[in-house]
Amino acid sequence: MAKAPMRVAVTGAAGQIGYSLLFRIANGDMLGKDQPVILQLLDLPQAQAAVKGVVMELEDCAFPLLAGVVITDDPKVAFKDADVALLVGARPRSKGMERKDLLEANAQIFTVQGKALDEVASRDVKVLVVGNPANTNAYIAMKSAPNLKRENFTAMLRLDHNRALSQIAAKTGKPVSSIEKMFVWGNHSPTMYADYRYATVDGKSVKDMINDPVWNNDVFLPTVGKRGAAIIEARGLSSAASAANAAIDHVHDWVLGSNGKVVTMGIPSNGEYGIPNDVMFGYPVTTANGKYEIVKGLEIDAYSQEKINITLKELEEERAGVQHLLG
């Protein structure tokens, strides 16, 4: 028996990340090879022609799972009955723009989108915010949607997670698929803390294999934290395909389960590990049956606590910077 199509809303559909994302969703990479999808694409009025061009290409791929496409500049049309919403579109930082101005510009976008989701999306919609600053944008959307469950709103830390996995694989000479229990705490920003103290390869401790605190502090964490900037420097454009891939991974595992593997998601805190309530924070989680669960009982040593405090401080400052816009 064929499954009913799932409705997937994507904002910023004409952008670089959107272009890397849509074909993979339509191919079944995100929701499964037996799950038809209807894509509901949102972008600004001036981007509608570009979105139509992308849709022409989607049609030309003749994806068996693509059951329909909606193109719109109205959030209420894009989010109507959405089962999954990928909030990719955000205001990028322009030259000379203060961080405060960036936060405020995005707060306006994500307040509108949060309210629209609240009004028209499926009550079980799974929302992933990709557009930066992702954690705070997710917090704003969540706060603007009081009738949806808090846990429906998440921020993308999976790119940091995947970047960290790749660096550890390179350092240990082991395949990336063999690394388990590596995760990231905090904000999707250079302050994130990638933590491999519990990580294993084939049951052996990664920390013991590497055994190099200087590498951890001076090479590993800065490389992962500043990878986005390094890609812009090299490519002249921001990381789009790897961000799209991380979004696919995040939603795939959330919907279909991570099979016991620990992954990283930015989720609203309930006070776990001393993080204040409602802060949208990167946590180690496992996922099953469409739900995520924070990994409990991890010991936080003094070094890790210091790193967690730094990223938390940044998130609290961002939150304070938009609080007056949330009414």
Swiss-Prot record:
Where does this protein hold NAD(+)?
Answer: G12, A13, A14, G15, Q16, I17, G18, N106, Q113, V130, G131, N132
Pfam families, per this entry?
A: Ldh_1_C, Ldh_1_N
List the keywords (alphabetical).
Answer: NAD, Oxidoreductase, Tricarboxylic acid cycle
Alphabetized CDD domains for the sequence: MDH_chloroplast-like
So where does substrate get bound? R93, R99, N132, R163
Offer an example of a GO molecular function term for this protein.
L-malate dehydrogenase (NAD+) activity
Q: Which PANTHER family match?
A: MALATE DEHYDROGENASE (PTHR23382)
Role according to the record? Catalyzes the reversible oxidation of malate to oxaloacetate.
Indicate what this protein is called per its UniProt record.
Answer: Malate dehydrogenase
Q: Which organism is it from?
A: Cupriavidus metallidurans (strain ATCC 43123 / DSM 2839 / NBRC 102507 / CH34)
